[in-house]
Amino acid sequence: MCDDDVAALVIDNGSGMVKAGFAGDDAPRAVFPSIVGRPRHQGVMVGMGQKDSYVGDEAQSKRGILTLKYPIEHGIVTNWDDMEKIWHHTFYNELRVAPEEHPVLLTEAPLNPKANREKMTQIMFETFNSPAMYVAIQAVLSLYASGRTTGIVFDSGDGVSHTVPIYEGYALPHAILRLDLAGRDLTDYLMKILTERGYSFTTTAEREIVRDIKEKLCYVALDFEQEMQTAASSSSLEKSYELPDGQVITIGNERFRAPEALFQPAFLGMESAGIHETCYNSIMKCDVDIRKDLYANTVLSGGSTMFPGIADRMQKEITALAPPTMKIKIIAPPERKYSVWIGGSILASLSTFQQMWISKQEYDESGPSIVHRKCF
């Protein structure tokens, strides 16, 4: 299957980034922001070839003159016209393939509304004429990528986080918990606490700068109170960051205060449980006989689990909640930013998977609802 001519395409549509490539590859070929930008002002320069919309990196680089919109909010597609633009861009500009020649594996958020899966299926077959397609749950793919079939995945991206217990390859829907707290919220919170320090970030374009600060400088403290004291008494934790205009800003306790919101959502004014408690609650909703396997196989996945120190902190917090003799293992693969995509690449290239595709013929016979029968 690693021959590009017939290779399946794997597209992981996240709230923040699209990861796309060919099944059998070990990393996605195209990773670009899930954004569609439209000009804020009427173009005055005739013949400049100004477009009415820009997608991905191009939208990002022209962000100063555009209004940026994310068609995927909290992991779920909310704007199908823009989503179609993103898929079109993925096939024709990024991967440079004809979608009618390749089977395509798409990913979806856990607990995705049924109508959404049907709409995805319909667009693939009717707009892009795909020969075959499949929709897989993101967290399940992350678990495959870690070489397991049983475990609990904490998947946290830009728009949403989920804890998904999986047993022998099947997600347990009654125990899946969703947390509307993820990378974008942490970026917004970092914008807010940097404003308190006297730096002003307000526009959608400036938010991207703060996201970069977050990705480069933030980390999770093992002991938050202790770290706050260290930060107050010395400048050892301070780092500087150069803004695009050359101004240099200094960032101190904000480095760990922003990601701390994952463990203490009250920082964001949210009443929900932190990620450690959410994981624990999710495990407790499972059958008592499989909990041991879940504790011992807690897999982190997604870009918002990339903070240094997050695995150790998670280990510490879950150990405090779990029964005293329980063996707890947090698995944080270095490539976890792309583990959903990697899992999709593995799945779509398995010989045993080939019978699982929904073919164009099956779609024509049954319509969009076929997706519920074949993808679970």
Swiss-Prot record:
GO terms for molecular function: ATP binding; hydrolase activity. Keywords: Acetylation, ATP-binding, Cytoplasm, Cytoskeleton, Hydrolase, Nucleotide-binding. Its EC number is 3.6.4.-. Coiled coil: none annotated. SMART domains: ACTIN (SM00268). It is an enzyme of class 3 (hydrolase). This is Actin, cytoskeletal 2B. It comes from Strongylocentrotus purpuratus (Purple sea urchin).
